[in-house]
Amino acid sequence: MEKFEGYSEKHKSCQQYFVYPLLFQEYIYAFAHDYGLNDSEPVEIISCNNKKFSSLLVKRLITRMYQQNFWINSINHPNQDRLLDYKIGFYSEFYSQILPEGFSIVVEIPFSLRELSCPKEKEIPKFQNLRSIHSIFPFLEDKFLHLDSISHIEIPYPIHLEILVQLLQYRIQDVPSLHLLRFFLNYYSNWNSFITSMKSIFLFKKENKRLFRFLYNSYVSEYEFLLVFLRKQSSCLPLSSSGTFLERIIFSRKMEHIGIMYPSFFRKTIWFVMDPLMHYVRYQGKAILASKGTHFLNKKWKWYLINLWQYLFSFWTQPRRVHLNQLANSCFDFLGYLSGVPKSSLLVRNQMLENLFLIDTRMKKLDTIVPVTALIGYLSKAQFCTGSGHPISKPIWTDLSDWDILDRFGRICRNLFHYHSGSSKKQTLYRLKYILRLSCARTLARKHKSTVRTFMQRLGSAFLEEFFTEQELVFSLMFTKTSLFSFRGSHSERIWYFDIIRINDLVKPLN
């Protein structure tokens, strides 16, 4: 544990900055406003009653922050007219949004300076095509085939508010800024409780997206810091004072004896101990830790992580949040796919002169399946079909024009096919296309007070072309004799589209 503490202090030694005086600078809030406008996600900040950013209100905010009783009034009256000023409710909502956003800009400065001032151990190459979330799937196809075990980790959100502040205290040794952070957290949740209310988390995330992302990323960076430590120090954990590592010491002595008798075996095994081939992927509050080795060794890795997480965060890490499974016998839910690495047999016929040989080869392949049941459940929730998958009309869209209705249904269908184009079994996607296409026909028929059969006969092939993906249209142009009504495309080809940088709306709720 002393080695871990020394490594932790060395890692955080470059992050001592005093940033609280920057809160009294007007340009900080202008930066916050610009970041809000240029954000990749739509945000509702720096506005009050549909009013835009005002430098005059910022000056008034800074002037009131200089007053001695400013924070006293805010703490004594936290529920009157929103935040920060219970006497002038007209500006209170503006202040409650602009001050946390400005605070987020300020506390992010030390982390940016750390990247510039601290020496880099190794330059990491940048690849432009890795912006896509789908870039992870070719990585899984390349790496996971050679691994044995996989751990599903649920990053825990129930954590005491004071622990969040203490985590930042190691990086930002600025007492006024930490007190201000305590004030923000105290406003959205009871200080004597844990963050277990999803309602409080949703409210805080909705109104202060930038501050929420900063706190979450800080928490996750500390969470993942242990993985970096264990990865670099995997062969340097012989704590003689702990009984947990007694077996490792005996194991090392056995390795010395084996090294004398079998030098080649000794080098190979030591390489395995020093380089456990760990691969870590994090997504949407969950993480996957895959490694190579025996089940017993991976189980020990699991408990190393749990014990160190408990030591770092000072709370009980629930062991059930880390699920350890054999990669060949299990599947995992990952970014809208049910993925696994099953072993499949490949029969190869080989003929040499007059002899014929049949060779049965066992191969591993990354299998990605579309969770059709979950997608049908979400389509049912969006009122495109019933719970059993029977298509129904969408009455709320009957006020739109015909081509707007066609465009909306067609866009949803194309997005689903576009996102799940990497599936190894696409047959289930055509069931979703059937649901959306018939739901669209029922919606149009309901609008024109007609039957589905009559309306589809009137539209003809134009109605079907709206639901075709780009890949299918290319194939339909290449093979003109193929009927548009019976075309099904290839079920085995997998195409990873690298232009998707976020999960579409129909996939996001599934994770």
Curated annotation (Swiss-Prot):
One GO term (biological process): RNA splicing
Subcellular localization: Plastid, Chloroplast
UniProt keyword tRNA processing, yes or no: yes
Cited InterPro entries: Domain_X, Maturase_MatK, Maturase_MatK_N
GO cellular component: chloroplast
Source species, domain of life: Eukaryota
This protein's UniProt keywords: Chloroplast, mRNA processing, Plastid, RNA-binding, tRNA processing
Family, per entry: Belongs to the intron maturase 2 family. MatK subfamily.
Protein name listed in UniProt: Maturase K
Lineage: Eukaryota, Viridiplantae, Streptophyta, Embryophyta, Tracheophyta
Name of the encoding gene: matK
